[in-house]
Regions:
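Boundary at the C-terminal end of the N-terminal hydrophobic targeting segment
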Residues: 19-21
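Bacterial N-terminal signal peptides that target proteins for export
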Residues: 1-8
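A general, composition-driven signal for non-globular sequence regions
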Residues: 16-17, 31
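N-terminal accessory beta-strand-rich subdomains and adjacent acidic, glycine-rich linkers
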Residues: 24-209
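Bacterial N-terminal signal peptides
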Residues: 8-16
Length: 209
């Protein structure tokens, strides 16, 4: 079962340490305590279109099967206005995006919330970045910034500034969440509400948590 368009929790980014990069087409991260594991990798379809995918494991058990990741961007009008009228226009913006390299870093720290049940929150994670680009002379790039916490997985898309000042018009979020059949979730429709233990297929309306 695939869920699309869900919002990931936003988390404040801090300075990372021990950064190193490698030439690879796959990023693999494990949280500091080995609780969560996430992979990002590229695949090419029979038609020749590229795709970005990811998986998530919890305590060596798959909780998110192979799921699609990425953005759809429509810059056609802006490209034409700047005289770039010969660029490829693939069906999906990600179709000709390729992984160039990945980088890794670690972070260990604490932060103080403005309010809440705890006065001090641990901020420990392993991080990585997937660096992608197009090879069609468009100079488009996309970075996927990933973090693995013992409490969960977080990732976001980052579009580096284009060298020719082409504006990025994001028109769709391609991120999918492929759960195994029978996956259950504790759901609450509003703060201080009651939790229900439901099959994820039953979550047809937005919920707060």
């Amino acid at each position: 079962m695939i869920k699309k368009g869900l919002l990931l929790p936003l988390m404040a980014f801090a300075v990372s340490t021990a950064l190193y990069a490698e030439k690879s087409t796959q990023l693999e991260l494990t949280s500091p305590g080995g609780v969560h594991k996430v992979k990002f990798y590229g695949k090419t379809s029979a038609s020749g279109a590229n795709g970005l995918y990811y998986t998530v494991d919890f305590k060596d058990k798959s909780i998110l099967k192979e799921s699609k990741a990425g953005l759809h961007v429509d810059n056609r009008v802006w490209e034409m206005a700047l005289g770039k009228r010969t660029l490829q226009q693939p069906e999906c913006w990600m179709d000709n995006m390729e992984i160039d390299s990945v980088s890794y870093s670690k972070h260990s720290g604490e932060w103080t919330p403005l309010y809440g049940e705890r006065s001090l929150v641990k901020d420990n994670y392993n991080a990585g970045v997937v660096y992608m680009s197009k090879k069609d002379k468009s100079k488009y790039r996309l970075n996927v910034e990933v973090r693995a916490y013992d409490e969960g997985i977080a990732f976001r898309y980052f579009l580096p500034e284009h060298p020719d000042a082409i504006f990025h018009k994001v028109t769709g979020d391609l991120t999918e969440y492929s759960f195994a059949d029978g996956t259950m979730a504790w759901s609450e429709q509003w703060a201080q509400g009651w939790f229900e233990h439901l099959d994820v297929n039953a979550l047809t309306n937005p919920v707060e948590r």
